Amino acid sequence: EYGHFVEGFATLTGDDCETLSLPVLGFYGDWFAAENIIDAPMYTGESVYMTQGMLSTSVAAGDIFAGMNEAGETIPEYISFSPNGDLEMDTAFPILGLLRSAETMTVEVLNGNMVPIRTLMSTTQIPKLLAVDYADQNGIYTILTDSMQNYIEWDGTVYDQSSGKYVACDEGQYYLSVTATLPGFDGEQTVTMPVKIDLTA
């Protein structure tokens, strides 16, 4: 079918030799019009990884999935963190399931009006996940959370030019926005996820 990947194995056999099986990956269609770079957030119902029973794109607060209820469902309006210095849910960061390797990636914080107020990371050459380690609690998002977590964590502050220091943001609605591009292509994909600063709940 046009616009889809084809995966399988090519098997070479002979009368007086070992059988050799090789993995084959092909794509038929327009490469740049194919699937997204970043998997859709888990709560949208459109996540590719979720259909395979794996966790995927979301927001973490500290060491837990933010906004997740007892049934394991993520409720977007409940995604929040509390940067109050108690070492519990003090930071928020995006968890990303990559469907394809990215040429560039930028992670930003937006205010309630969807205006960028801080850039957490801007980097290049982000590889697609090549394997899933079910023994690792980080699962499919190991690549980003392990190697880049320190860069994409948001502690609830923004830079204040007048004082030259980072200052705490007010409670309320914010967003984590991730923009990625493909190698050799000018188009980009942006995934934006809500996150609240809540110091009173």
Q: Could you tell me what each predicted segment is?
A:
Residues 1-201:
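Low-complexity, acidic Ser/Thr/Pro-rich "mucin-like" tracts of secreted and single-pass surface proteins
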